[in-house]
Regions:
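Short, well-structured beta-strand-loop connectors
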Residues: 67-78, 126-141
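A residue-level detector for short acidic-glycine micro-motifs
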Residues: 77, 119-122, 141-144, 159
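Short glycine/proline-centered loop/turn elements that form peptide/ligand docking sites
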Residues: 126-128, 144-151
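Zn2+-dependent peptidoglycan hydrolase active-site motif and core
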Residues: 61-62, 70-121
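Short hydrophobic beta/alpha edge segments that flank linear recognition/processing sites
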Residues: 90-92, 105, 134-146
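Histidine-centered catalytic micro-motifs
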Residues: 116-121, 150-158
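Acidic, glycine-rich catalytic/binding loops that coordinate metals and/or anionic ligands
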Residues: 1-8, 18, 94-97, 125-131, ...
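Non-catalytic extracellular/periplasmic "stalk"
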Residues: 1-60
Length: 198
């Protein structure tokens, strides 16, 4: 039974066991490292993500815009050679689940958590494995590499860079939630929220 608002749906026949799963589980991955992941899309003042018809990545406001480190840490993963062509080979996931993100950076922070920045622009990485970074440092540019339909930044925090990683919640500071006209000093961002950075 699934509850949505005031409607209840009888989705399954009675007396059966079901388990939710993600498509990548068939490739040997059984954890939910994207449980608290975000896809950030840059908008104009009219909340549009692109100009024209959006047929080219160049039409998108976010394409080639700077990406900054969310916190101090050390680069533990860096991939820079995926094309910005929306191509993705799902069979590579078993060897490396980070293939989902195309060009990608993983930064390990003092508490052990790792922040992931995915779908970065080919050859835009300004850091490499082993580099130390500081919060707010420019590290790359937004692209459309990996399993991406349009230019955006995939951001998540996880327990490990390896396959057994679990997703961790992210807290954001100094942003405005435009729908509620409220400043968020520190807290969560809801999926679908439009926020203004300050």
């Amino acid at each position: 039974m699934v509850y949505e608002g005031s409607l209840s749906f009888n989705l399954f026949p009675p007396n059966n066991y079901f388990r939710t799963m993600h498509f990548i589980e068939v490739y040997g991955l059984s954890t939910n490292f994207m449980r608290y992941a975000y896809d950030f899309v840059l908008l104009d003042k009219e909340n549009r993500k692109y100009t024209g018809d959006g047929a080219s990545e160049l039409d998108y406001y976010g394409f080639n815009k700077d990406v900054y480190a969310a916190g101090n840490g050390k680069v533990v993963y860096a991939s820079n050679d995926h094309k910005d062509d929306k191509s993705f080979d799902v069979t590579k996931l078993k060897k490396n689940p980070l293939e989902l993100y195309g060009n990608c950076i993983g930064i390990q922070h003092k508490n052990g958590a790792i922040s992931i920045y995915g779908h970065l622009k080919q050859n835009s990485l300004m850091v490499k494995m082993g580099d130390s970074v500081v919060s707010g440092q420019k590290i790359a540019a937004i692209g459309v590499s990996g399993s991406s339909f349009f230019p955006h930044l995939h951001f998540e925090v996880r327990t490990s860079i390896m396959n057994a990683a679990e997703g961790l919640p992210s807290y954001f500071s100094n942003i405005y939630a435009l729908e509620s006209n409220m400043k968020i000093k520190s807290g969560f961002v809801e999926t679908g929220s439009i926020v203004l950075t300050k």
